[in-house]
């Protein structure tokens, strides 16, 4: 395979991989917010859970809104780097909540590996968006 074809395929694979990660992260945030917190537990149930952790009940509504809006913006490819970074405190809170449960997701209350993975994925999405922005000053970035 020629070097130019290999380079073109490599660039396309990188863009496709970035878009796939961004899209998947957006779907995760949306479903975690709407399906889990709103439809499964309900607003009152989610607020009650937050209160049981010693957090103000209103925090639940902020987290639901942040995950729903952030997920939609990631799916729409709007302000990707800033959205991915802005959602890190939400994931940090989730990591804090699950930290005492152990590593495995099947642990009572869920493990902390999933929030940690999502933190890393969000940082990668933000870094990729910054990299695309920096490498394409003369055109609108595909995943900015």
Placement of each model-derived feature along the sequence:
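Extended, low-polarity transmembrane helix blocks
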Residues: 1-38, 58-65, 69, 75-144
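Membrane-interface interhelical connector segments
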Residues: 38-53
């Amino acid at each position: 395979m020629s070097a130019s074809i290999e380079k073109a395929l490599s660039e396309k694979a990188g863009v496709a991989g970035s878009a796939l990660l961004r899209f998947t992260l957006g779907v995760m945030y949306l479903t975690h917010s709407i399906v889990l917190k709103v439809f499964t537990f309900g607003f009152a149930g989610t607020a009650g859970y937050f209160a049981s952790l010693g957090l103000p009940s209103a925090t639940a509504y902020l987290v639901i809104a942040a995950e729903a809006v952030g997920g939609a913006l990631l799916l729409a490819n709007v302000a990707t780097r800033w959205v991915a970074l802005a959602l890190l405190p939400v994931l940090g809170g989730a990591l804090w909540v699950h930290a005492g449960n152990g590593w495995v997701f099947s642990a009572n209350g869920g493990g902390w590996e999933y929030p940690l993975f999502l933190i890393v994925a969000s940082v990668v999405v933000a870094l990729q968006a910054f990299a695309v922005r920096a490498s394409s000053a003369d055109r609108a970035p595909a995943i900015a």
